[in-house]
Amino acid sequence: EQTIKRVTAAFDVLPLGDNVRKPKVGIVGEILVKYHPVANNNIVSYLEAEGAEVILPNMMDFFLYAAYDEQVKRRLLDGTLGNVIKSKLFMKFLDYYRKPLNIALQKSKRFSAYEPLSALIALAEKHLSTGNMAGEGWLLTAEMAKRHR
């Protein structure tokens, strides 16, 4: 927790060029394509070389999405109560470890805290059902809607 505070504080005091304005470009897609340079043809390096600030979704949302799908399966399909319980426990575990980082990011001058999964779900549900689970289903829609705001 202290390390998170120190790192966030250190980034907050790094000098920035006042005249440097970069267009922000969000990358969305399947998890492998978003994060693996070979799978995405080095898109991050290419965009940065072209002067863009690349915004990648945080990976934790993918794990929360996968866990939450067990709850959707129970509600809409034929999911098991055992998987729902495991899903909720796993999500609480992830949120517990993400909380100190979120607090530090909220206090930061330059960073934004992570949105709760419920906010991503609400964004997605404006366009489709969370029952869309193929690939990364509704999470892709939520990521696109988030970047569009």
Where are these regions (language model features)?
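An N-terminal assembly and electron-transfer interface module characteristic of large anaerobic redox
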Residues: 1-149
